Amino acid sequence: MTEIVKVREQLQISLSDFQEQASLQSGQIFVVGCSTSEVLGERIGTSGTMEVAEAIFSELKQFQDQTGIELAFQCCEHLNRALVVERELAMKYQFEIVTVTPVRSAGGALATYAYHNLKDPVVIEFIKADAGMDIGDTFIGMHLKHVAVPVRTSVKEIGSAHVTMATTRGKLIGGARAVYAAKEETITCR
């Protein structure tokens, strides 16, 4: 099995496992951070390839087609972890669009591939995603809503890259009298 075929298979399993647990809904935002260098067993930022980026992008687009989620591709630290998204998503949520074109050496291979393969791509600096996937320890946490909830899947690595996934939930707020699930006895004021 070639490395690319293995990466595709691992990604398919990981996304399927994730969806079984997280049940993402159409329209929710899914952020992806990825080091294609780490996928190939190299140090982050040193050996990124468009071939690996294409394979990962392709699987993520299939996941999007199946679930209706919106994708956001995190750039590398050289672009302050900005995100590549469809213009329609940026306009819908009034995300501020910034002017930059990701390239493999400043943006990363996956974000660059996404920029050249989305319908109408733009780059934004900030987002609060409903869920996400981190391939190669790229640190997507800054782009997740509070509160992040880790999701464990059967896949621990994509290629040679460590993979983590998370969904989010609303904050539990209040004090000693706060209620988090409506029950008959909590509906009326007494």
UniProtKB/Swiss-Prot annotation:
Pfam families: DUF436. InterPro entries: Antibiotic_NAT-like (IPR028345), DUF436 (IPR006340). It comes from the Bacteria. Belongs to the UPF0340 family. This is UPF0340 protein BCE33L5016. It comes from Bacillus cereus (strain ZK / E33L).
